[in-house]
């Protein structure tokens, strides 16, 4: 008998509840004034559309990951080993990359011994620096809040949260923490983002940079992008942003490769379960704990929108917290 996935059961129960609300008939209340205001069904229909959009986004995301894993599998394995699982591919790549670096280093040393000056890198360290500059330089991405700025923000935020004791190092690996950080980034005003970029350009990359920017006087209310769960840009929205997908994938891979021992198939689920609270309410509380910490710093207007007559948004966040990828995706 297979292992019961509690998260999937909770998520399924949420879907059943949503479907029951959608299929509820109006005969239960025959008041014509109530039937004249179809606000509740309209919001339920919008909620259903948003869930469908997010699932489509996740399906595309998984298809992209599957293609990347297939290419990596073909690179690190021979044709006879193309059925290797994803964690086997990642661990094979962990040893394959140093082998390639060693080969490149030997070739570069051979080139240097013959005094071959071709204008290109002459050492492994120079190659690494050139490669890093290709993907982290200011000219590689637009300076409008895309990947390099978000990665700097993510690192500083994580350092500030762990240094302040808001989260533990173990909790730093949770997807809900990434969701909260993405929400904070989406809610930063353009003025605060510009202040952070200026500090990063001056190579002040410590956690104090973020804390100081958060303590600046609050900007006008209209300049703050309150995304909440209605936004299509934040992680708690129903469509993942490119920078969120980029960093979550990179963080998952880095965490996986950081393990000193290869997990067995039977223990992989238990390893992942130990890093994820099974109770969606605990995930939601952790999310709000991070948000409230930065609200205390006046970092952003990070209130989650709530409809007084139809408080669906909080349930949607908790539904988000129950979503997990299958074990085979890891």
UniProtKB/Swiss-Prot annotation:
Gene Ontology terms, MF aspect: protein dimerization activity
Outcome (variant: residue 25 to I): Found in patients with non-obstructive azoospermia; uncertain significance
Keyword Nucleus: yes
Subcellular location: Cytoplasm; Nucleus
Tissue specificity: Expressed specifically in testis and fetal ovaries.
Entries under Pfam families matching the protein: bHLH_STRA8 (PF23175)
Ranges in coiled-coil conformation: 88-112
Post-translational changes noted in the entry: Phosphorylated.
Cellular component aspect of the GO annotation: cytoplasm; nucleus
Motif annotated as Nuclear localization signal (NLS), chain positions: 50-55
Primary location group: cytoplasm
Alphabetical GO biological process terms: activation of meiosis; cellular response to retinoic acid; DNA replication; meiotic cell cycle; oogenesis; regulation of transcription by RNA polymerase II; spermatogenesis
Alphabetical keyword list: Coiled coil, Cytoplasm, Differentiation, DNA replication, Meiosis, Nucleus, Oogenesis, Phosphoprotein, Spermatogenesis, Transcription, Transcription regulation
Top-rank taxon, per record: Eukaryota
InterPro entries assigned to the protein according to its UniProt record, in alphabetical order: bHLH_STRA8, HLH_DNA-bd_sf, Stra8
The protein's role, per its UniProt record: Meiosis-inducer required for the transition into meiosis for both female and male germ cells. In female germ cells, acts downstream of ZGLP1 as a key effector of the meiotic program: required for premeiotic DNA replication and subsequent events in meiotic prophase. During spermatogenesis, next to its role in meiotic initiation, promotes (but is not required for) spermatogonial differentiation. In complex with MEIOSIN, directly activates the transcription of a subset of critical meiotic genes playing a central role in cell-cycle switching from mitosis to meiosis.
Complexes and interactors: Interacts with XPO1. Interacts with MEIOSIN.
Official protein name in the record: Stimulated by retinoic acid gene 8 protein homolog
């Amino acid at each position: 008998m297979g292992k019961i996935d509690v998260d999937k059961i909770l998520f399924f129960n949420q879907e059943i509840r949503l479907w029951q609300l959608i299929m509820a008939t109006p005969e239960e209340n025959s008041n014509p004034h109530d039937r004249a205001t179809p606000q509740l069904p309209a919001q339920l229909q919008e909620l259903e559309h948003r869930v469908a959009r997010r699932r489509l986004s996740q399906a595309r995301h998984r298809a992209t990951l599957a293609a990347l894993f297939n290419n990596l599998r073909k690179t690190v394995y021979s044709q006879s080993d193309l059925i290797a699982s994803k964690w086997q591919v990642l661990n094979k790549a962990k040893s394959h990359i140093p082998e390639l670096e060693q080969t490149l280093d030997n070739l570069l040393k051979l080139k240097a011994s013959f005094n071959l000056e071709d204008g290109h890198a002459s050492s492994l360290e120079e190659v690494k620096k050139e490669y890093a500059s290709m993907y982290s330089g200011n000219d590689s991405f637009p300076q409008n809040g895309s990947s390099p700025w978000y990665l700097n923000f993510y690192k500083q935020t994580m350092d500030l949260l762990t240094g302040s004791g808001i989260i533990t190092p173990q909790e730093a690996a949770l997807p809900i923490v990434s969701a909260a950080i993405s929400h904070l980034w989406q809610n930063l005003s353009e003025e605060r983002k510009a202040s952070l970029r200026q500090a990063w350009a001056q190579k002040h990359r410590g956690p104090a940079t973020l804390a100081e920017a958060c303590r600046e006087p609050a900007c006008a209310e209209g300049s703050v992008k309150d995304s909440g769960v209605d936004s299509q840009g934040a992680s708690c929205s129903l469509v993942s942003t490119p920078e969120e997908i980029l960093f979550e994938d990179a963080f998952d891979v880095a965490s996986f490769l950081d393990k000193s021992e290869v997990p067995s198939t039977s223990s992989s689920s238990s390893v992942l379960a130990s890093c994820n609270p099974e109770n969606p309410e605990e995930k939601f509380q952790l999310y709000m704990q991070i948000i409230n910490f930065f609200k205390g710093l006046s970092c952003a207007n990070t209130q989650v929108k709530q409809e007084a007559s139809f408080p669906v948004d909080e349930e949607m966040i908790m539904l988000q917290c129950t979503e997990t990828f299958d074990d085979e995706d890891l």
